[in-house]
Amino acid sequence: MIRLQLTIASVIAVIFAGGLAPTARAAESVTYEVASSDVGTASGIEYFDGARRDLLQNVSLPWRTTVEIANPTSLGTDGAEVRASWSTGRLNKFVMVRIYFGDKVRCENALDLGNAACYGSTPFTTAIK
């Protein structure tokens, strides 16, 4: 009887452990883009590469890179994110930052204030359609 109870307890433990284990997800292809017809160089571009945040300085525009991210829509520090900063000293010098999930635009933001950002957690656009 004790052997049967131990066997049943073991089977139940295995079932629950498998049911509660996190499901592995394949990384998604995420493309970051920073472009402008008004500004030739971004003083800084910061983005999450799937493992850590990278900061590039004095980057010629347009700039684009593709990375693999396990959870690009995360609200945490492991989600897709791109920021660009620039300084022209004048208004109406727009820079556009974009995040693509595959070939679909997830976020795009155009600003002339010297700093623009996009986050994979938030579908967003400033484009006029």
What would you call each of these model-derived segments?
Residues 1-26:
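Secretory targeting and sorting signals
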Residues 18, 24-26, 36-39, 89-91:
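A generic structural signal for short, solvent-exposed coil/turn residues
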Residues 26-37, 75-84, 129:
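Noncatalytic modules at the cell exterior or secretory-pathway interfaces
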Residues 27, 33-59:
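Extracellular, modular beta-sheet/disulfide-rich ectodomains of secreted and cell-surface proteins
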Residues 48-95, 101:
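Mature extracytoplasmic domains of secretory-pathway proteins
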Residues 99-107:
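Proteolytic-maturation and junctional protease-sensitive modules
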Residues 106-129:
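C-terminal partner/receptor-binding element of secreted or periplasmic proteins
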